Amino acid sequence: MRMYETIFIVQPDLGEEEMKGISTKVQDVIASMKGDFKRLEDWGPRKLAYPINKFARGRYYYLRFDGDSALIAELERRLRLDDKVIRYQSVKLEKEVALAAAIPTKVAEEEAVESAEETKVETTTVEE
């Protein structure tokens, strides 16, 4: 199974129940196709770069999951058939990229600690 992420945009004027229905439907598709659901984030309403179907704004959702190509095909088919979804895009993630993104955080923390230690040394020499 490979890791994927999908970002989809729904109409901005949907009610809470309709938005929950869409997110539940997406999670059900992943579960029915034996995928591994990781995360679903509601990024909220944002202005679109250009009007889509006469909408200037849309509510963005970020989805991360493990699955195969059949799962992607079924998920995109269901999103395409739903009139409330105005755009979607799925991307396959590489494991090396996901791990590499976590490594700079550790490096930045180590550099911050070293910087703090150097500041203490400089402060100590100034006080003497």
UniProtKB/Swiss-Prot annotation:
Any single GO BP term: translation
Coiled-coil residue spans: none
GO CC terms: cytosolic small ribosomal subunit
Molecular function via GO: small ribosomal subunit rRNA binding; structural constituent of ribosome
One Pfam family matching this protein: Ribosomal_S6
Keyword terms: Ribonucleoprotein, Ribosomal protein, RNA-binding, rRNA-binding
Biological role: Binds together with bS18 to 16S ribosomal RNA.
Similarity comment text for this entry: Belongs to the bacterial ribosomal protein bS6 family.
NCBIfam families for this protein: S6
This protein's name: Small ribosomal subunit protein bS6
Gene: rpsF
